[in-house]
Amino acid sequence: MTKSANTKRCIKIVVSVTLRLCYHAMENSLAIIGAGRVGRALGRRLRELAWKIGCVVTRREASARRAVRFIGAGKPCAGMTRQILASSVILIATPDDEIPGVAQQLARIGAEELRGKVVLHTSGALDSRVLDTAREHGAAVGSMHPLQSFSGVTVPSLEGKVFAVEGDARAVRVARQITRALGGSPVRITGGKKVLYHAAAAMAAGHVLAVEEAATQLLVSLGMRRSEAVRALLPLTRQVLENFERLGPRAAWTGPLSRGDYKVVKAHLEALRDSPEEFAEAYDALNGLAARVLAQGVAGMLAELKNVSVQRKPKTKVMGSNA
């Protein structure tokens, strides 16, 4: 190989590496709109991973400054500003009903500068169509939802957590890169079905919590201290979930309904007459759901449950959450 050829080859390598570094630096710059629990937590984790944090946008500068302090980097911005466009990735972490308006404002202030940007939102229920205004101006749009609860006090570990991603190809690619960098596992969801994914998450989190609290209140109504009731129920719940993971749903299913003991099921419903009506209604509905998703003879079990359902009289008693 001649000296000239070597020189050309070296120049190509240098140019290639330089372009990669520039591309990497550009891809790893992030603006955050909406600095609530999710926005702050993701911002902090990404800052720890050497992402360059640009604008952190909230309605008021004081809250933006607090968010920047929590994240450890960024420029506090009160309201939408063109400085957002200095970052290559724009993360919208506002409440769901504000996301379409944010996209419209981005289009208004960005216009042609949106071309080539990646705009992601973190809603669990909404898909990327709410960002169509930004898409029309050349941005690649998508959504990235971590299947994780955020307390706002500490930053949870995202290691092994599932992130639902969807949207344009480039936006999905960036969402996957972010997810993997955070230690998460990206799962692509069909945009039009995303709300069903969110319903599943709500059942597994919020509804399980409601059932656990209802059971706790029932034990408290019998004279247990709340701490005793929680201590009694949590190991039971944990064991069921561990069995669900290890053995599968049917093998983990316990209780009178799993054994076809309808007399006990009816006795439970009778005992719940003195509780607020939602308790017996939920117990009844959950029996039906268990029959539908766990029983082998679904029709027969549903028929038996219909026979033992208790017709309730209206009640006014209220069981407080701090009973």
Label every model-predicted segment.
Residues 5, 14-17, 25, 318, ...:
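Acidic, Ala/Val/Gly-enriched low-complexity intrinsically disordered segments
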Residues 23-82:
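NAD(P)+-binding Rossmann beta1-loop-alpha1 motif at the extreme N-terminus of oxidoreductases
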Residues 55-58, 119-122, 163-166:
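Short, hydrophobic beta-strand segments that form beta-sheet elements in well-ordered domains
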Residues 65-70, 134, 138-139, 155-246:
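Internal alpha-helical scaffold of NAD(P)-dependent oxidoreductase catalytic cores
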Residues 71-154:
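Rossmann-like NAD(P)(H) cofactor-binding subdomain of soluble oxidoreductases
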Residues 240-300, 308:
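Interdomain hinge/lid region at the active-site interface
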